[in-house]
Amino acid sequence: MTYEKNIPNATAKRLSLYYRIFKRFHRENIVKTSSKQIAEAIGIDPATVRRDFSYFGELGRRGFGYDVSKLMTFFAELLNDNATTKVALVGVGNIGRALLHYRFQERNRMQLVMAFDTDDNELVGSQTEDNIPIYGISQIKDKIAQEDIKTAILTVPSVKAQEVAELLVDAGIEGILCFSPVNLNLPRHVVLQYVDLTSELQTLLYFMKEEEKARRNND
């Protein structure tokens, strides 16, 4: 199946939602579905579903809809969920510790296999309840190379984010999910995604305010 490589960011961010919905439909023994049903399950409009899917060629057939099993397999391959992806975590502060206890593998094929923090951190040398080892930052290059890890989660203070990100790239990391509220300057081949909790909360509050305005206008 051929499809456009440069899909919009908004569409890319919905891919995991589509995959989750098709897995749910499959568990519920639903054989085929429609853009309307998909849209209702996600909370968007059917036109958005059809537009998103159009970037990937003919995913459905007019008059039939979408084959659930076929689309579940398609999105699994698209999101590389047919093979286990090893992930390293750098920074075991509040966010990092929470992520260490998040059971990634129960929901998909991602596996958090190791964590790092400053060499003098009291947690260095220990393991989590799930047997995830915590190493000192000085071991980052050797340990990541041993496990051939290409993906990392970065949850360090902003002032250290650039320095640590460069260490990760030198160690062979090709994709970073960054929780630090700072723009990283890294080689073009490194894929970056940012999670800004403050920004997300502000966006939530904005939509709550707009919803309140709409209710008042309808009263």
Swiss-Prot record:
Signal peptide: none annotated. NAD(+) binds at residues 91-96. It holds the Pfam family Put_DNA-bind_N. It comes from the Bacteria. Keywords: Cytoplasm, DNA-binding, NAD, Repressor, Transcription, Transcription regulation. GO terms for molecular function: DNA binding; DNA-binding transcription factor activity. GO terms for biological process: negative regulation of DNA-templated transcription; response to redox state. It is found in: Cytoplasm. InterPro entries: CoA-bd, NAD(P)-bd_dom_sf, Rex_DNA-bd_C_dom, Tscrpt_rep_Rex, WH-like_DNA-bd_sf, WH_DNA-bd_sf. SMART domains: CoA_binding. GO terms for cellular component: cytoplasm. Residues 17-56 bind DNA. Belongs to the transcriptional regulatory Rex family. PANTHER family: REDOX-SENSING TRANSCRIPTIONAL REPRESSOR REX (PTHR35786), REDOX-SENSING TRANSCRIPTIONAL REPRESSOR REX 1 (PTHR35786:SF1). Modulates transcription in response to changes in cellular NADH/NAD(+) redox state. Homodimer. This is Redox-sensing transcriptional repressor Rex. It comes from Streptococcus thermophilus (strain ATCC BAA-491 / LMD-9). The gene is rex.
